[in-house]
């Protein structure tokens, strides 16, 4: 059974009109993983899956545009979906911030497993491996394997992190491209050109850009990334489904 990636939200840092922040649904057979849980992604998740069928949750880091729906998700899972003990993987800092935001314990719903650089774990059919990126808080990119298929997600990173830390043989790379070219190096994020170059160096077969700022010029980003990648590049949009 192949892997599908559904974009639940892809706006960088904040959601634009009608948009949602970072979140993705990874599915294969009866395995369904909610990867990053930014504001707006729980609503979009319900367009594609009954939330009771979630196999696990993975959160890349503690910036709220990547986990902001977890506190409201707690109420939904605990009181309406009757779903408890969901295997949840994230950094220790993310868990602490979630507990503060929710105002109390969360482990009855989110069975938390702390992950860090080099962590490996399985959720259903998926095998995950983590690598810490170039970002102000501990941020984990993930490599996801199912059979011979490989998906990789950078989460947030600057150019000081080598994508090759996730290994080679990446069939589909979902790579952040937050900034326009004239802001390269201003903060720990990538431009589209930097994303394209990193994907080429890592030998990725397919590149999808995500985490662009609301209002960003998508065609310019696509063109700049493709020039460095050496092949066509796609731009993530909410509710886009990508099949491997």
Which residues does each predicted region cover?
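Cap/insert and terminal regions of metallo-dependent hydrolase folds
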Residues: 159-243
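Divalent metal-coordination and catalytic microenvironments
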Residues: 5, 24, 36, 45, ...
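Catalytic core of the metallo-beta-lactamase
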Residues: 103, 113-169
């Amino acid at each position: 059974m192949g892997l599908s990636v559904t974009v639940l939200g892809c706006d960088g840092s904040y959601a634009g009109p009608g948009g949602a922040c970072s979140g993705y649904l990874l599915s294969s057979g009866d395995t369904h993983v909610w990867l990053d849980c930014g504001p707006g992604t729980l609503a979009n998740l319900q367009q594609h899956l009954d939330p009771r069928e979630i196999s696990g949750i993975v959160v890349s880091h503690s910036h709220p545009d990547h986990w902001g729906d977890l506190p409201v998700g707690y109420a939904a899972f605990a009181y309406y979906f009757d779903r408890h003990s969901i295997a949840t993987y994230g950094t220790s800092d993310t868990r602490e911030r979630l507990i503060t935001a929710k105002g109390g314990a969360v482990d009855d719903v989110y069975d938390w497993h702390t992950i860090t650089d080099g962590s490996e774990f399985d959720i259903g059919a998926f095998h995950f491996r983590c690598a810490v990126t170039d970002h102000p808080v501990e941020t984990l990119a993930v490599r996801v394997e199912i059979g011979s298929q490989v998906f990789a997600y950078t989460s947030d990173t600057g150019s000081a992190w080598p994508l090759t830390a996730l290994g080679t043989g990446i069939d589909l790379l979902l790579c952040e491209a937050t900034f326009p070219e004239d802001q390269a190096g201003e903060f720990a994020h990538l431009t589209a050109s930097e994303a394209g170059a990193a994907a080429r160096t890592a030998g990725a077969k397919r590149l999808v850009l995500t985490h662009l700022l609301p209002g960003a010029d998508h065609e310019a980003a696509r063109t700049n990334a493709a020039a460095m990648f050496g092949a066509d590049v796609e731009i993530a949009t909410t509710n886009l489904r990508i099949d491997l």
